[in-house]
UniProtKB/Swiss-Prot annotation:
It comes from Mesocricetus auratus (Golden hamster). Belongs to the cytochrome P450 family. It is found in: Endoplasmic reticulum membrane; Microsome membrane. This is Steroid 17-alpha-hydroxylase/17,20 lyase. GO terms for molecular function: heme binding; iron ion binding; lyase activity; steroid 17-alpha-monooxygenase activity. One of its GO terms (biological process) is glucocorticoid biosynthetic process. The lineage of its organism: Eukaryota, Metazoa, Chordata, Craniata, Vertebrata.
Amino acid sequence: MWELVALLLLTLAYFFWSKSKTCGAKSPKSLPFLPLVGSLPFIPRHGHPHVNFFKLQEKYGPIYSLRLGSTTTVIIGQYQLAKEVLVKKGKEFSGRPHMVTLGLLSDQGKGIAFADSGGSWQLHRKLALSSFALFRDGNQKLEKIICQKASSLCDFLLTHNEESIDLSEPIFNSITNIICIICFGISYENRDPILATIKSFTEGILNSLGNDHLVDIFPWLTIFPNKTVDMIKKNVKIRDEVLSGILEKCKEKFNSDSISSLMDLLIQAKTNADNNNTSEGQGSNAFSDMHILATIADIFGAGIETTASVLSWIIAFLLHNPEVKKKIQKEIDQNIGFSRTPTFNDRNHLLMLEATIREVLRIRPVAPMLIPHRANSDMSIGEFSIPKFTPVIINLWALHHSEKEWDQPDRFMPERFLDPTGSHLITPSLSYLPFGAGARSCIGEVLARQELFLFMAHLLQRFDLDVPDDEQPPCLKGNANVVFLIDPFKVKITVRQAWKDAQAEVNTWRP
């Protein structure tokens, strides 16, 4: 009996202690919620989630919470608060909440993108960043690789002159090959079946993640048959089989004196860890084959469909705004001409092109809602208390479409990134984070910026891109997903007359 009384007293003491600890703490305003289902009945079901959450700010403010099942999640839609989470308190908010679907993608939190903060995540992120240093000079210089793939894409399009085609597949293949060179030191021919396989499992995973996932809110639902979960498992299995085959080939030819890819760096780290030739806390457990595959899969997921999607968005907006395309081509003609192909140094002169890229990244961000963060301890955001383990989601769409930060935010206006004279690039608002910020920022930002600029400069130097005859410009609504995708559309490809004339002149002078 006395044991029962003691237990009761301890329970009451803990209750009053916890109440006193949170007494006076201010929580963000919350959506209504019901037992079991939480706020689900009060979240708009039609339209893009990022737009719906942005609209909810009108009632609940730039930071608010909602219940997903029994879990309280905080939504951030203001730059100052987002910067606090991502940068000022980036370490404290660097955690990742466990989600069924993301766990399936990452073999339960391995790799970089979906891994919780900790030693393994830091190691793999550091190695991924180090891989870009392998491509600084010589024939393996990153810019040279990108230019080669951009030129190959242009050569392919020359065979489709005056035709209307969907550019998504050739663009996807070009970007995939760049990532394959970085990851494995391998490039594939356009007709190689492995490219079709990569495209298939990538699209399969993205399409699966685009569905509503009640299993992420109610994990116990996994005991029942679930088509979405089955589809994710199927495509992840194919992905891992492809990457495992490449990993084994890389192991066979591995030479510690010739490190030329991210896979080599990971294999080297694994070898050092296995031989205890590593720092304390960096053991071989962090470099199992599944850890390596998860990291490579993250680079694939973050580096292929994202860049390919943005290129499609840029082309789509140029089809809607042909006067912008003409301004870019005029810049190319005046600053580069046709005797050479563009380089990244030309970015200082092709200001309208760079401004267009920045505007597309604003108006159609790659990830309208960033992957959820999680508080690693009891924290605060602004004046609000955030308990440990609370998921926090940055609504990037809200940052990029705030009328307080942007003039006519829903209007495509590349000139907003230029000064009044059009001679300098500017940042009109700090509320602009296309690649995130802080410890969880996109590790491929430098690569992506080079790819977007060089591919578009190469394309517009040689071709006119127009709406096909008797067709309408592409729909700009897009499909909300982990990556913000545009619906497939066709483009009429026409070799520019100025390019033809320049090539004819070159041929005339050849002996």
